Amino acid sequence: MPNLLEKTRKITSILQRSVDSLDAELPYNTMAAQLADIIDCNACIINGGGNLLGYAMKYKTNTNRVEEFFETKQFPDYYVKSASRVYDTEANLSVDNDLSIFPVETKENFQDGITTIAPIYGGGMRLGTFIIWRNDKEFSDDDLILVEIASTVVGIQLLNLQTENLEENIRKQTAVTMAINTLSYSEMKAVAAILGELDGLEGRLTASVIADRIGITRSVIVNALRKLESAGIIESRSLGMKGTYLKVINEGIFDKLKEYN
């Protein structure tokens, strides 16, 4: 049976691995599963707004309402507000506690249900909450040491996620700005008309039709599309006589165009 040191090493080793795809609906599912396995419990990670980032159900709780939280990926406001007022780990909360993960209607079925809440901090900010629970067995002192370490590790990963998201947004904004600055007045006019033709972020268009409607040459539209594609703003594919298929992959172009209108 792994001892405390071995379990601690397993948790800290999580920092050496990346989270699931940041585009995934639950980017921290794998991490939650690893922590649940190490601490021997059910676990979930929510951000400051109560959005579910990842969870692992090692043991069946038979609570439909809790499982609904996981399906909608959003915890109720009253619970999020209560959890946000927890500044230090609250351990071994009974089913009668307001912070218990076990709904009131199932108290009789899980009279020995235990919940532990740990705040997640990173860079001096509250980033979320780490929630673990068991159907009966209390969390020992060793378990709680692991919880403290786990919440710190999750905090570091959440901070990394925020940094990566910020860097990605800056990269996209920079790409849009540089692309816009290379466009002539006519090309800017063409881009606005092209994006207005799309059904959301993608669609089919005919360059000659757009050119005739806004009073520019087809070559202007072709040049504008080429510049946007080389900047990673759009993807395009010729459909032959049917026109061109277009997909926007950097949505920042829409906001940038509004600034020029």
Curated annotation (Swiss-Prot):
Residues 1-159 are annotated as: GAF domain. GO terms for biological process: negative regulation of DNA-templated transcription. The keyword Nucleotidyltransferase does not apply. One of its GO terms (molecular function) is DNA-binding transcription factor activity. It is found in: Cytoplasm. InterPro entries: ArsR-like_HTH (IPR011991), CodY (IPR014154), GAF-like_dom_sf (IPR029016), GTP_trans_reg_CodY_C (IPR013198), Transc_reg_CodY_N (IPR010312), WH-like_DNA-bd_sf (IPR036388), WH_DNA-bd_sf (IPR036390). Keywords: Cytoplasm, DNA-binding, Repressor, Transcription, Transcription regulation. Residues 207-226 bind DNA. One of its GO terms (cellular component) is cytoplasm. Pfam families: CodY, HTH_CodY. Belongs to the CodY family. DNA-binding global transcriptional regulator which is involved in the adaptive response to starvation and acts by directly or indirectly controlling the expression of numerous genes in response to nutrient availability. During rapid exponential growth, CodY is highly active and represses genes whose products allow adaptation to nutrient depletion. PANTHER family: GLOBAL TRANSCRIPTIONAL REGULATOR CODY, GTP-SENSING TRANSCRIPTIONAL PLEIOTROPIC REPRESSOR CODY. HAMAP family: HTH_type_CodY (MF_00621). This is Global transcriptional regulator CodY. It comes from Streptococcus agalactiae serotype Ia (strain ATCC 27591 / A909 / CDC SS700).
